Amino acid sequence: MFLSLPTLTVLIPLVSLAGLFYSASVEENFPQGCTSTASLCFYSLLLPITIPVYVFFHLWTWMGIKLFRHN
């Protein structure tokens, strides 16, 4: 049973955000170690947030173009 594209488009960013909030609440030194852009930790948190957001808006734009073209 596969989930549809609109469901995955909403579900993946929400799961990624929930994972970030979970790791922020569990890890004791989360804010101290990940605020500097020179640290690798900053980018290891930035990529899991950026990629689902990019995919969401890319698919949203693509679906909008498809719907505009067919109406």
From Swiss-Prot:
| Gene Ontology process terms (BP) | GPI anchor biosynthetic process
Pathway assigned to this chain's UniProt record: Glycolipid biosynthesis; glycosylphosphatidylinositol-anchor biosynthesis
Q: Which UniProt keywords apply?
A: Disease variant, Endoplasmic reticulum, GPI-anchor biosynthesis, Intellectual disability, Membrane, Transmembrane, Transmembrane helix
Q: Tell me what topology the record assigns in the membrane.
A: Multi-pass membrane protein
Gene Ontology cellular-component terms for this entry are:
endoplasmic reticulum membrane; glycosylphosphatidylinositol-N-acetylglucosaminyltransferase (GPI-GnT) complex; plasma membrane
- The record lists the membrane-crossing segments as 4-26, 45-65
Q: Which domain of life is it from?
A: Eukaryota
Which ranges make up the Cytoplasmic topological domains here?
A: 1-3, 66-71
- One Pfam family hit: PIG-Y
- Explain what the record says happens when changing L46P: In HPMRS6; may diminish protein expression and/or stability; decreases cell surface expression of GPI-anchored proteins, including CD55 and CD59, in skin fibroblasts from affected individual
Q: Which residues lie on this side of the membrane: Lumenal?
A: 27-44
Q: Where in the cell is it found?
A: Endoplasmic reticulum membrane
What further note is attached to this protein's record? Answer: PREY and PIGY, 2 apparently unrelated proteins, are respectively the product of an upstream and a downstream ORF contained in a single bicistronic transcript.
Q: What does this protein do?
A: Part of the glycosylphosphatidylinositol-N-acetylglucosaminyltransferase (GPI-GnT) complex that catalyzes the transfer of N-acetylglucosamine from UDP-N-acetylglucosamine to phosphatidylinositol and participates in the first step of GPI biosynthesis. May act by regulating the catalytic subunit PIGA.
PANTHER family from the UniProt entry: PHOSPHATIDYLINOSITOL N-ACETYLGLUCOSAMINYLTRANSFERASE SUBUNIT Y
User: Quaternary structure?
Assistant: Component of the glycosylphosphatidylinositol-N-acetylglucosaminyltransferase (GPI-GnT) complex composed at least by PIGA, PIGC, PIGH, PIGP, PIGQ, PIGY and DPM2. Interacts directly with PIGA; this interaction regulates glycosylphosphatidylinositol-N-acetylglucosaminyltransferase activity. Does not interact with Ras proteins.
Disease as annotated in the protein's UniProt record: Hyperphosphatasia with impaired intellectual development syndrome 6: An autosomal recessive, multisystem disorder characterized by severe developmental delay, dysmorphism, seizures, cataracts, and early death in some patients.
Q: Name the chain's protein.
A: Phosphatidylinositol N-acetylglucosaminyltransferase subunit Y
Q: What is the lineage of its organism?
A: Eukaryota, Metazoa, Chordata, Craniata, Vertebrata
Q: Which gene encodes it?
A: PIGY
